[in-house]
Amino acid sequence: MRKLLAVFSKGRWKMEQKLQEQLDGLLEKYTELLLGETNDELKEEVKQWILYTHIAKSMPPLAKHWNATYPDAKQGIKEIIQHIKELNEAHRNKQ
């Protein structure tokens, strides 16, 4: 049984690693299409923007609570949103 669990766990880890790599590729391409360029810092900003905007749209009370609890983080996410908006507009104007 232990051996079976070890094999299952190892297989699951490989699937999770593969999924993580594929999601990272998706995020990289999305960042490139959205902003016209990509790097680790931009990918992280886009990931945070995606997460926050999804939560704000799907569970507004949770986002409101988080904003009230962490006003410094709220300011940080506002800056990220503004930065992404500016980069996106610049990218669209180049096309």
Swiss-Prot record:
Output the InterPro entries linked to this UniProt entry: Uncharacterised_YusU
Q: Which Pfam families match?
A: DUF2573
Where along the sequence do coiled-coil regions lie?
A: 14-50
Decide whether keyword Coiled coil is in the record.
yes
Name the domain of life this protein comes from: Bacteria
Entry keyword set: Coiled coil
UniProt-recorded name of the protein: Uncharacterized protein YusU
